[in-house]
Regions:
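Histidine/acidic residue-rich metal-binding segments in metalloenzymes
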Residues: 1-73, 84-101, 118-121, 158
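His/Asp/Glu-enriched, well-ordered alpha-helical/loop segment
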Residues: 37, 43-50, 92-180
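A structural signal for short secondary-structure junctions
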Residues: 47, 68, 95-96, 164-167, ...
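C-terminal regulatory/interaction regions
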Residues: 222-231, 235, 242, 248-264
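Short, charged, surface-exposed secondary-structure boundary motifs
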Residues: 84-88, 112-114, 184
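C-terminal cap of metal-dependent C-N hydrolases
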Residues: 168-222, 230
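Short, acidic/turn-prone active-site loops that include or flank metal/cofactor-
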Residues: 21, 78-82, 107-109
Length: 264
């Protein structure tokens, strides 16, 4: 870890690291070092603005606040952690301590989709339910996590995350006339942001532009063969399933049995 830190400092890179991701990690840290992960990293000097701490699944509110105060950032993947662990990470404590939070979708096999609209909605709802408070994690806050604050958290705030002079032209065009996003009101109540966070699914995105290049127009992907990629992904998944079915180690996994039974 110290060597990684030296290289990152020398090259001006951030460190992307899963931190306090699960109870097994914490258990192993206590057995090996007598310290929980956040304290261990703090002792090594890794908790600073160069660390993107992913998940914080098992971090306490106090540990999350410590990481935030040190200047580290959080990559929050509400969907996958909710599905896999049934836990709401301490993003509220992290933000309350002044930390920057970025939203991530983790992995398709972990949350069943890579959809930032879904992550916005789940982040808002999970935290409202956890704290029994409808004012926790309002729509505008999670939208910022998905855009400008998320970009800042991963060290790209000067390049992307908002439409400003000098930044890269990354944008999407959303069909606000879609039934699930209607009506749109400007006053006395403005509902565009809540509609995007709570009602959008991503299918309302008509056009995608990255660095000024249009990658999708009117829902037609221009730079990739979408059909071929989907077909290949399906075939690769079948091959993985075949190998897992023949692997005696995987056959003993309770998680696999639960998935076969449709319990997840």
């Amino acid at each position: 870890l110290l060597q990684v830190k030296r290289i990152a400092c020398r090259e001006g890179w951030m460190i992307h690291m899963h931190v306090a991701q699960g109870d097994r990690e914490i258990e192993q840290m206590l057995k090996r070092y007598g310290r929980r992960t956040p304290d261990f990293l703090d002792d090594l000097g890794l908790l600073d603005g160069g660390l993107l701490a992913v998940h914080l699944t098992e971090a306490t509110d106090e540990e999350a606040a410590l990481i935030a105060r040190r200047g580290s950032r959080l990559a929050l993947c509400s969907g996958s952690i909710g599905i896999i662990d049934g836990i709401v990470p301490p993003a509220r404590a992290f933000r309350d301590a002044g930390g920057l939070v970025s939203l991530g979708s983790d992995q398709a096999s972990g949350n069943n989709c890579s959809n930032i609209f879904t992550e916005m909605k789940l982040t808002a709802l999970f935290n409202k339910i956890r704290f029994r408070d409808p004012e926790v994690m309002p729509a505008w806050e999670v939208l910022r996590m998905a855009t400008i604050e998320g970009a800042r958290a991963i060290g790209l705030g000067d390049e992307v995350g908002s439409l400003e002079r000098g930044k890269q032209a990354d944008l999407i065009l959303v069909d606000l006339g879609a039934p699930n996003l209607t009506p749109v009101l400007d006053g006395p109540v403005r509902n565009i942001v809540p509609n995007l966070v709570y009602a959008a699914s991503g299918h309302e995105v008509r056009t995608v532009m990255v660095a000024g290049q249009v990658l999708m127009r009117d829902r037609q992907v221009l730079t990739l063969n979408e059909g071929a990629i989907v077909a290949e992904a399906q075939e690769q998944a079948r091959e993985v399933a075949r190998r897992v079915a023949a692997d005696p180690v995987h056959r003993e996994m309770a998680l696999l049995s639960a998935m076969e039974a449709g319990q997840l």
